[in-house]
Amino acid sequence: MSKIFVNPSALRSGLADLEMAEETVDLVNKNMEDSQAHLQGIPIDVETLPEDIKRLRIADYKQGQQEEDASRQEEGEDEDFYMTESENSYVPLQSYLDAVGMQIVRKMKTGDGFFKIWAQAVEDIVSYVATNFPAPVNKLQADKSTRTTLEKVKQAASSSAPSKREGPSSNMNLDSQESSGPPGLDWAASNDEDDGSIEAEIAHQIAESFSKKYKFPSRSSGIFLWNFEQLKMNLDDIVREVKGIPGVTRMARDGMKLPLRCMLGSVASNHSKRFQILVNSAKLGKLMQDDLNRYLAY
């Protein structure tokens, strides 16, 4: 039987390794106990507590869960209040206006006139808004009812006309109250009763100058051109509108030349949004009054 000889130094190193392993195990156990002291109910020694420690509180789990659900519900309601970019119709409008602005800059760099560029841009913007932002049905019905009420009031006023015994001054005041027109225009001259021949004369003179452009004062202290074609209205509707201008029916009955620029300005200021944006209303009233006085003086 062979004998195995063990070196004493190897035994000593093995014992040292065992002692180190035991110390390592003891250290690991101590660290585990320290880290799990809060689970065993052992108080933890803290040298310095945070300043906001008083604000900490222990709440019931169910109560905290209810509060969290309530806060989430409120956040959901806030999100419902705001529309997303796909739902907000003003987002594409802003993009469209940015594109129009870039187009205006490019045209101005090529040397085109500013008033021409601006007039076209305004027309495009108005058309875009009218197409993408239609008026509500309730508003249209309210406008129709208001217009019907005004027509009934005018019919009642015309049926209760003053007698012949009243003076001419009272007739003039009544006609000036019933007639309509832009502010600043003097309605002292009254219209006489018209018939088919008067409407035919008015329509004839307007048709002859339907595409002729007239100068009007603009908001930018300049002028711009406008004609009857840009009203996008039927000739019969234009004739009915201009009959409300004082003196027009009398001049048409006498076969006189009519103040077409005054008539165009009156109709456009009431029925054209683009014209309302471009024109200087104060200067327009004075211009129409001057034209009317000049034609009535002949």
UniProtKB/Swiss-Prot annotation:
GO molecular function terms attached to this record: RNA-directed RNA polymerase activity
Q: What Gene Ontology biological process does one annotation of this record name?
A: symbiont-mediated suppression of host JAK-STAT cascade via inhibition of STAT1 activity
- Asked if the Swiss-Prot or TrEMBL record annotates the protein with the keyword Chaperone, the reply is yes
Q: Which domain of life is it from?
A: Viruses
Please give the residue ranges the record annotates as the region Disordered: 61-80, 144-192
Keyword Chaperone listed? The answer is yes
**Record's function text:** Non catalytic polymerase cofactor and regulatory protein that plays a role in viral transcription and replication. Stabilizes the RNA polymerase L to the N-RNA template and binds the soluble protein N, preventing it from encapsidating non-genomic RNA. Also inhibits host IFN-alpha and IFN-beta signaling by binding and retaining phosphorylated STAT1 in the cytoplasm or by inhibiting the DNA binding of STAT1 in the nucleus.
- What's this protein's name? Phosphoprotein
**Organism encoding this protein:** European bat lyssavirus 1 (strain Bat/Germany/RV9/1968)
